[in-house]
């Protein structure tokens, strides 16, 4: 008897029916991200979006793509997959907001060893939540089953976003000047960077991730899996309220690699390390791993997920705008003359 295509494919390790079930399970989560501009429904060959460009004189599209990295291993060890998608969205939208762009839509890509519909739907529920927090629509995605290439439980997650900003309103660091103020927007922890080192130091494969830690005030697993903060709405509100001259998403490479990306030649962001409010999880990692201070600031966000540089006259307005969106930002430095672009002292 001739084997049907789907049966033959299933025998090779790819379960098409699991894919169909996954789409059905995630449909409600996807639809709750839909905002004005969404034209297509889930399941089409392409995601359609008609942006409202009213009031823009020269709209510019801004794209960003990223993944979650080895933080995914924590999700697997804890068997908790419904928040990791927030990280995926955050890593993309927090990048495009650095030039002042509002994210419009998002697409995700999941590569997985074995397609378990409930697991995939949980991952996508996190992606949807991230999109809701960012105010963008989830208009498409792909789940690819990779038998023979990935272990059954393994998966990778990546995403792609497109935003828009009116060209005259693109954040221009060329206007930055001595005396401008550096604001720190608190992070929720490691966010989605440095997890290869984190996993090694904490020996997560053998650690009791569910044990309550008095120093942390929570379990180690909770501290390590906490989702990345999405700064889109707070930063957009800050841009409306203040004279924003630079925004830096503090990701891999920490302060030393990310702050200079928004600092023009001849100027330097002088950061007061004593002002930085660093969560206990960072100090615990530093102590346990014997990591020196410079390496910590050159690898992790150290409690600052985003740095926003504003004119001194509008610093209070910026802080108030961020506070109104639930972000307790604070001053952590100033712009001075210099060639190093960032100095921590």
Map each language-model feature to its residues.
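Glycine-/charge-enriched secondary-structure boundary and capping motifs
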Residues: 2-12, 119-137, 150-157, 208-209, ...
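Glycine-rich phosphate/pyrophosphate-binding loop regions near the starts of catalytic domains
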Residues: 28-188
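Residue-level signature of catalytic and energy-coupling elements of molecular machines
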Residues: 15, 66, 179, 249, ...
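Short, acidic (Asp/Glu-rich) active-site segment that either coordinates a divalent metal cofactor
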Residues: 156, 169-216, 220
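Short, glycine-/Ser/Thr-/acidic-enriched flexible segments
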Residues: 53-54, 67-68, 162-166, 188-190, ...
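Hydrophobic face of alpha-helices
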Residues: 23, 121-124, 195
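Buried hydrophobic packing segments
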Residues: 22, 26, 48, 92-93, ...
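N-terminal amphipathic/basic leader segments beginning at the initiator methionine
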Residues: 2-37
């Amino acid at each position: 008897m001739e084997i049907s295509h789907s049966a033959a494919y299933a025998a090779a390790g790819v379960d098409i029916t699991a894919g169909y079930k996954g789409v059905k399970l995630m449909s409600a989560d996807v639809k709750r991200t839909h905002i004005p501009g969404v034209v297509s429904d889930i399941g089409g060959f392409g995601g359609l979006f008609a942006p409202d460009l009213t009031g823009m004189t020269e709209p510019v599209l801004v794209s960003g793509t990223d993944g979650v990295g080895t933080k995914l291993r924590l999700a697997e060890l804890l068997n908790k997959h419904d928040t990791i998608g927030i990280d995926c969205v955050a890593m993309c939208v927090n990048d495009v907001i650095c030039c002042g762009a509002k994210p419009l839509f998002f697409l995700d890509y999941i590569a997985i060893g074995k397609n378990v519909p409930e697991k995939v739907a949980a991952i996508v529920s996190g992606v949807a939540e991230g999109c809701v927090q960012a105010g963008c629509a989830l208009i498409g995605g792909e789940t690819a089953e990779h038998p023979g290439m990935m272990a059954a439980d393994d998966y990778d997650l990546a995403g792609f976003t497109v935003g828009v900003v009116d060209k005259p309103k693109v954040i221009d660091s060329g206007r930055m000047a001595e005396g401008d103020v550096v604001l720190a927007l608190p992070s929720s922890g490691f966010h989605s960077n440095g997890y290869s080192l984190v996993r090694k130091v904490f020996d997560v494969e053998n650690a009791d991730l569910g044990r309550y830690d008095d120093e942390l005030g929570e379990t180690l697993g909770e501290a390590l899996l906490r989702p990345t903060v999405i700064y889109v709405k707070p930063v957009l509100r800050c841009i409306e309220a203040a004279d924003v001259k630079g925004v830096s998403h503090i990701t891999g490479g920490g302060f030393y690699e990310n702050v200079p990306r928004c600092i023009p030649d001849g100027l330097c962001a002088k950061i007061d390390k004593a002002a930085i409010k660093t969560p206990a999880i960072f100090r615990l990692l530093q102590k346990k791993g014997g990591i020196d201070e410079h390496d910590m600031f050159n690898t992790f966000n150290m409690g600052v997920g985003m740095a926003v540089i504003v004119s001194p006259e509008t610093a209070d307005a910026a802080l108030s705008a961020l506070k109104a969106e639930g972000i307790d930002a604070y001053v952590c430095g100033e712009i001075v003359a210099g060639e190093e672009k960032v100095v921590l002292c």
